[in-house]
């Protein structure tokens, strides 16, 4: 079991007047190192702890960890390369980048990696050894040069780079083949480029990645923490031939950057395989036929298809002959075909796994009405929780339990076979206080999940007040319950889980503290001795205690229960099936309670739509081309079947229709009477104005549309689809520049999953923190579930101001 008794860390990264010394460190919240050589010291801030690490003389300090509540600093000789990282509450681990790096900058004078062989493959002699060669440079004579073990170093500032004495008596020394760091040049296609060039090839200034002006985009730094999207520096997050950026020119959306190639060989990309492992980026076999039997054409060829996935543009991807490869982060190896009518297809590569996981759709004979529904709450400490939640209290996506990226760990399905470690679902394999997961953010090792305890009354329906959105964890709330991690909790709980009274935040007895006071945190609600969470602790609200032997402890503040009328919160947890709308996944009945069926007054279903308030439905404007008279239409709510409607459905006529004035494919319908909000009829939430969904965000479409002969016709179906950034969607091989900024793409480029005729106007919803938000209205596509032709949806966030104005004035 991983140790986790120490406490969450202050999330303040204060700026130092001398610069930003913490830039020299990689930080990971919720992580600790097993260390033998260490010192435990007091420190009032993270910077003070970093200074102690720099000043240490008894050993080389490679890392430190800081415990904010105790103001405790532990400096260590080890880092993740030499020790085990484990999960711990209330701590942040800082590791010096220079000791994690296996590349050199300039002549490698500051190289502190672990390469220990020369360029000819001879093992290096230890710097402290005198055999077989008596050294001129040793740890004793040059203590500040990092002459540890037998690692390659450059103590004499040699222009040719790091070197070492060799273990060959005939060869006194030789140079080491250390790759260049990608801060001034790039290896391969610049996927790991970390430099500061911020102009394009034509000299245009780059737009900052965290800006949506002048170009709105889906490459949001907080959603892609491992892509290093800093400031406005050129980067390559999506498999282009080289780094690029969005430009500050409103007339030029994006352009490649001119980054020079490094002159040294690139770092090793790891083992290669003759079979499919993961997404096949390291597949090096000789399959050259696609899934439908088309022959692949050579990567160097430009007929019958012109393209830029060439050996020159992707020099590290082994684009040999016409073999299937995955040079750009697709879901599997693929190739361009020799068929002029089929530009490219995925290849069928044998799996490296002895028993590959089936990707067939669920059993079509399983009666959907009888399918058990997993409740999204947990009992006790959550060890028995087997739901499908995969989001933390701060909205981070969970890392798969079988994955070692970005966090290496031992909580695997093999090591914990009875813990239900499926996919990336929240679990509690080690008897913690509640379900948790490792996160996909490299700087945050783990967090608790955004789940509440079961109350015993889950699923009960209260009388429906007006629709209202719940606040998030940051919104101050005076209720004696909390949202998320309770950072906005402003209730009056003032005792810990053990019943000990809390110390007042302004008091310095019995515990003296400097960081969490009303003066230093004036907006954190540090009144009297009430439980609070000023540092965003994953454990929730806490306080310093009045027990002189116990510095602090957590408070027992429950999660606020969601009511049946909260937008975006279904009473039946959706299946979240990876199956297909075309090819099928029948939804759990009433798990998408905002889905409506738009019908003629005679009852024929022809379009979908989304309930966004008791009186208003959002749909596609082209769905209203049948008639300009509202009386022609009616709306069915709460249905699971397209025909033979259930007795509880609501049938309401349309009283008014409003099409978007600039002719976007979006329209509002006002119902003749408000819908009755029940456990089967709940509105979806609207997004913030102009919000942009991040690239590769997994969202869901629903509908009763054409299923092309597959099972489930006539029942509400669902599919999980990734959002595709417009920059990618508008490539020549996909939708070739036809997608507007007021639209978004979603779908699997292999085809097979899409919305079809009859799904038009229906919702594309994305889960954010604790609710589903309507991000798209199904609009158009080229065919139905065709390869390379993802579906196109109206981007709802661009029309929120119009939507709210129409609703307010009518």
Curated annotation (Swiss-Prot):
Interacts with CSPG4 and AMOT. Interacts (via the Kringle domains) with HRG; the interaction tethers PLG to the cell surface and enhances its activation. Interacts (via Kringle 4 domain) with ADA; the interaction stimulates PLG activation when in complex with DPP4. Angiostatin: Interacts with ATP5F1A; the interaction inhibits most of the angiogenic effects of angiostatin. One of its GO terms (biological process) is proteolysis. Disulfide bonds join 49-73, 53-61, 103-181, 124-164, 152-176, 185-262, 188-316, 206-245, 234-257, 275-352, 296-335, 324-347, 377-454, 398-437, 426-449, 481-560, 502-543, 531-555, 567-685, 577-585, 607-623, 699-766, 729-745, 756-784. This is Plasminogen. The record marks 134, 136 as: Interacts with fibrin. CDD domains: KR, PAN_AP_HGF, Tryp_SPc. Pfam families: Kringle, PAN_1, Trypsin. InterPro entries: Kringle (IPR000001), Kringle-like (IPR013806), Kringle_CS (IPR018056), Kringle_sf (IPR038178), Pan_app (IPR003609), Pept_S1A_plasmin (IPR023317), Peptidase_S1_PA (IPR009003), Peptidase_S1_PA_chymotrypsin (IPR043504). It catalyses: Preferential cleavage: Lys-|-Xaa > Arg-|-Xaa, higher selectivity than trypsin. Converts fibrin into soluble products. Plasmin is inactivated by alpha-2-antiplasmin immediately after dissociation from the clot. Its main location: secreted. Residues 581-808 form the Peptidase S1 domain. It is found in: Secreted. SMART domains: KR, PAN_AP, Tryp_SPc.
């Amino acid at each position: 079991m991983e140790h986790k008794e120490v406490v969450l860390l202050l999330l303040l990264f204060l700026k130092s007047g001398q610069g930003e010394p913490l830039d020299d460190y990689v930080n990971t919240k919720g992580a600790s190192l097993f260390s033998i050589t260490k010192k435990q010291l007091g420190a009032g801030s993270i910077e003070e702890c970093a200074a102690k690490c720099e000043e240490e003389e008894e050993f080389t300090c490679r890392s430190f960890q800081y415990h904010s509540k105790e103001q405790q600093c532990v400096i260590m000789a080890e880092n993740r390369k030499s020790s085990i990282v484990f999960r711990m509450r209330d701590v942040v681990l800082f590791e010096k980048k220079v000791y994690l790096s296996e590349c050199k900058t300039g002549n490698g004078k500051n190289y502190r990696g672990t390469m220990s062989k020369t360029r000819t493959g001879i093992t290096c002699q230890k710097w402290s050894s005198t055999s077989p060669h008596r050294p001129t440079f040793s740890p004793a004579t040059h203590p500040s040069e990092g002459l540890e073990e037998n690692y390659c170093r450059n103590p004499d500032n040699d222009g040719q780079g790091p070197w070492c004495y060799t273990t060959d008596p005939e060869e006194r020394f030789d140079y080491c083949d250390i790759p260049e760091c990608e801060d001034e040049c790039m290896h391969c296609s610049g996927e790991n480029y970390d430099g500061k060039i911020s102009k394009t090839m034509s000299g245009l200034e780059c737009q900052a990645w965290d800006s949506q002006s002048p170009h709105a985009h889906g490459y949001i730094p907080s959603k892609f923490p491992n892509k290093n999207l800093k400031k406005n520096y050129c980067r390559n997050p999506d498999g282009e031939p080289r780094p690029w950026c969005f430009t500050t020119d409103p007339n030029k959306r994006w352009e490649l950057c001119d980054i020079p190639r490094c002159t040294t060989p690139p770092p090793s990309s790891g083992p290669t395989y003759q079979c499919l492992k993961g997404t096949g980026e390291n597949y090096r076999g000789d399959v050259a036929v696609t899934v439908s039997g088309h022959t692949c054409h050579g990567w160097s060829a430009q007929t019958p298809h012109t393209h830029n996935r060439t050996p020159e543009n992707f020099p590290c991807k082994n684009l040999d002959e016409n073999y299937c490869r995955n040079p750009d982060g697709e879901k599997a190896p693929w190739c361009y075909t020799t068929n002029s009518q089929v530009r490219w297809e995925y290849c069928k590569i044998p799996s490296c796994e002895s028993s590959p996981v089936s990707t067939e759709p669920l059993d079509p004979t399983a009666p959907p009405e009888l399918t058990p529904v997993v409740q999204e709450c947990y009992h006790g400490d959550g060890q028995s929780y087997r739901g499908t939640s995969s989001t933390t209290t701060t909205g981070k996506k969970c890392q798969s339990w079988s994955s070692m990226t970005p966090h290496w760990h031992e909580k695997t399905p093999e090591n914990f076979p009875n813990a239900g470690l499926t996919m990336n679902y929240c679990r509690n394999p080690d008897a913690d206080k509640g379900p948790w997961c490792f996160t996909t953010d490299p700087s945050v090792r783990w967090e608790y999940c955004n789940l509440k305890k079961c109350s015993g009354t889950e699923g009960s329906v209260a009388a429906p007040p007006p629709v209202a959105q719940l606040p998030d964890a940051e919104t101050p709330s005076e209720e004696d319950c909390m949202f998320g991690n309770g950072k906005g909790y402003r209730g009056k709980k003032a005792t810990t889980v053990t019943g000990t009274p809390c110390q007042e935040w302004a008091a310095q007895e019995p515990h003296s503290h400097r960081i969490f006071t009303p003066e230093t945190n004036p907006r954190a609600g540090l009144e009297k001795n009430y439980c609070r969470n000023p540092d965003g602790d994953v454990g929730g609200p806490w306080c310093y205690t009045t027990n002189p032997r116990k510095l602090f402890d957590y408070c027992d503040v429950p999660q606020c229960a969601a009511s049946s009328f909260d937008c975006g919160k279904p009473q039946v947890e959706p299946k979240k099936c990876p199956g297909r709308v075309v090819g099928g996944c029948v939804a759990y009945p009433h798990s998408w309670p905002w889905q409506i069926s738009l019908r003629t007054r005679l009852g024929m279903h022809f379009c979908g739509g989304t309930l966004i308030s008791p009186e208003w439905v959002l749909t596609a404007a082209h769905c209203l081309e049948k008639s300009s008279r509202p009386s022609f239409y009616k709306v069915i709510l709460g249905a699971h079947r397209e025909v033979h409607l259930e007795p509880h459905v609501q049938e309401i006529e349309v009283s008014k229709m409003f099409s978007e004035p600039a002719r976007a494919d979006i329209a509002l319908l006002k119902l003749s009477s408000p819908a009755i909000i029940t456990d089967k009829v709940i509105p979806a939430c609207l997004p913030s104005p102009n919000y942009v969904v991040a690239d590769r965000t997994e969202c869901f479409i629903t509908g009763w549309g054409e299923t092309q002969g597959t099972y489930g016709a006539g029942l509400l179906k669902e599919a999980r689809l990734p959002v595709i950034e417009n920059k990618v969607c508008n490539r020549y091989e996909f939708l070739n520049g036809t997608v507007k900024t007021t639209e978004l793409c979603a779908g699997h480029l292999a085809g097979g999953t899409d919305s079809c005729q009859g799904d038009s106007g229906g919702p594309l919803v994305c889960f954010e923190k604790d609710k589903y938000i309507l991000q798209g209205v199904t609009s158009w596509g080229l065919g139905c579930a065709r390869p390379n032709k993802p579906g196109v949806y109206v981007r709802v966030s661009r029309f929120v101001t119009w939507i709210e104005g129409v609703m307010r004035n009518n």
